[in-house]
A protein has these predicted regions:
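Short, contiguous strand/loop micro-motifs
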Residues: 43, 114-115, 172, 209-212, ...
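Catalytic core of membrane glycerolipid acyltransferases/transacylases, capturing the structured
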Residues: 75, 112-177
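Non-catalytic N-terminal targeting/anchoring module and adjacent flexible stem/linker
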Residues: 1-2, 311
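Residue-level preference for nonpolar/small residues embedded in alpha-helices
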Residues: 51, 123, 159-160, 181, ...
Length: 311
C-alpha cells in the first residue's frame, strides 16, 4: 500500500511538472525567453524520461536514429512544446501566433465541410486556430475520457479534459466520439462541419496495407472511407518547429478527393513517410510502431492514457 501510494504521488508530481507548471510558465513568458527555457529542459535526461527512453529504443530498431542524444533532445522538446501549445492557444491572440508561424499552402476556399487529417507528429495545435480562422467550424474526433480509467491520476484526467475543452472552444463544436461509430461523423459533415483527426491510431480496425520507411505496414482506412461516402475532400496537414528558434511551420497539402481508396491510402502513407523521414523524433506514437509495421496485432494494441486526447 505504501509503495502504491508513493508511486501514485510520483506520477501525479510528474504530470504536475511536465504538463501543467512548466508548460504554463513557458507560455506566459515572452517566446524568446520561454523557448530558451524549453530547450534547456529538453536537454535534461530526467524530463519525460520513461517515455523518451522507450521511444528511442523502438525508433532505433526501425533505423531512423542517427544521433541518439539528438533524437532524445528533440523528442523531449516536442513533448514539452505540445503541452505549452495548449496554454498558448488559450492565452495568446492570432497576432501573437502569426509572429511565430509560417504557413505553406492554404485551406480550401469557402466554408464547405472537409476532413482535416494528420498524424500524431510535431506540434499540431496551432493548426486548429489556422483552420478556424479560415471560417470553418470543426469537430475533433476523440475517444471518450472515462474518469474510471484515470483512477489515481487526477491531474492527468484534468489535463485531458482541459485539452478537449480547448479543441471544443477553438472548433466551436462538440467533440465527436470514435466509439459512437461513423453516423455522428457523417451527420457532422452533412451539416457542413469539418472533422479534425489523426489516423495513426492503433487497434481501430479497417487497416489497409501501405509502405512506410521502405517496409510493409498498415494504416486505418476509416477516414478514407468516410470521405468517399460523404463526398468531402481530405486535407492533410503537418506542423513542426525549428528546434533552434521554436518557430513553427504549417504545411497544408492540396485537397484529396477520394475516388480510389487504395490510391488515397498510399497518399496518406506518403505523407506520414515524409514526416518520419524529415523529423523522426517528432512522432509521438513510436510506442505503437509495431502495430503499424505488422510486428504486432493492432487489435491488441491500446492507447496509453497519456495518448487519449483529441488533438
Amino acid at each position: 500500500m505504501i509503495d502504491s501510494r508513493k508511486n501514485r504521488l510520483r506520477r501525479e508530481l510528474r504530470v504536475l511538472v511536465e504538463r501543467w507548471l512548466l508548460p504554463a510558465l513557458i507560455a506566459a513568458l515572452p517566446w524568446w525567453i520561454g523557448f530558451r527555457i524549453a530547450r534547456r529542459l529538453a536537454h535534461r535526461p530526467w524530463f519525460f524520461r520513461e517515455r523518451v527512453e522507450a521511444t528511442l529504443a523502438i525508433a532505433q530498431r526501425y533505423g531512423v536514429v542517427d544521433d541518439p542524444a539528438r533524437f532524445a533532445f528533440e523528442q523531449r522538446l516536442y513533448h514539452l512544446v505540445d503541452h505549452v501549445d495548449l496554454f498558448l492557444l488559450k492565452w495568446r491572440s492570432d497576432r501573437y501566433l502569426d509572429r511565430h508561424f509560417d504557413i505553406d499552402g492554404d485551406w480550401p476556399a469557402g466554408d464547405g465541410a472537409l476532413i482535416a487529417l494528420s498524424f500524431h507528429w510535431g506540434a499540431g495545435f496551432w493548426a486548429l486556430r489556422s483552420l478556424r480562422r479560415g471560417g470553418r467550424r470543426f469537430a475533433g474526433l476523440s475517444v471518450r475520457t472515462d474518469p474510471d480509467s484515470f483512477a489515481g491520476q487526477a491531474l492527468l484526467h484534468r489535463y485531458a479534459l482541459l485539452r478537449n475543452a480547448e479543441v471544443i472552444r477553438t472548433g466551436a463544436h462538440d467533440l465527436v466520439y470514435i466509439g459512437d461509430g461513423p453516423r455522428p461523423m457523417l451527420r457532422a459533415l452533412q451539416a457542413g462541419t469539418c472533422l479534425l483527426t489523426s489516423i495513426d491510431v492503433p487497434g481501430v480496425g479497417g487497416e489497409m496495407p501501405v509502405r512506410l520507411l521502405d517496409r510493409d505496414a498498415q494504416l486505418p482506412s476509416g477516414m478514407i472511407k468516410l470521405a468517399e461516402k460523404a463526398q468531402v475532400p481530405i486535407v492533410f496537414f503537418a506542423v513542426w518547429l525549428d528546434p533552434a528558434t521554436g518557430r513553427r511551420k504549417l504545411r497544408i497539402r492540396e485537397p484529396l478527393h477520394v475516388t480510389d481508396r487504395e490510391a488515397a491510402m498510399h497518399f496518406a502513407a506518403s505523407h506520414l513517410d515524409w514526416m518520419l523521414r524529415a523529423v523522426p523524433a517528432a512522432w509521438h506514437f513510436w510506442a505503437y510502431a509495431d502495430a503499424f509495421f505488422l510486428q504486432a496485432q493492432s487489435a491488441a494494441t491500446r492507447l496509453d492514457l497519456e495518448d487519449q486526447q483529441s488533438a
